[in-house]
Amino acid sequence: MFLHIGVDTVIKTEDIIGIFDLDTSTVSKHTRKYLNMAQKSGRVITVTDDLPKSFIVCTDEDDRSKKIIYLSQISSQTLLKRVGSIGENYLKRIKK
């Protein structure tokens, strides 16, 4: 299954490690340091020029030991609802 995270960007749901609210999670210095290191190593993809509201940590398809961080203008709550509805629809289909 795929999750639309903004503009023309979709990611595989099985690659998602976590979806985080940018405002609340960056209060921690550890999170800020992690995002800063990811940015410096070229592992951050900004989905839009709009102000980001969330970030999604995913495994890299080419190297599963590496992580990719997507910055999205869509709130973490909306993304989590989308993931939930994708999962519910999938379960309904396989139960038939």
Task: Go through the PLM ranges and name each one.
Residues 1-96:
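Eukaryotic intrinsically disordered, low-complexity regulatory linkers and tails enriched in Ser/Thr/Pro
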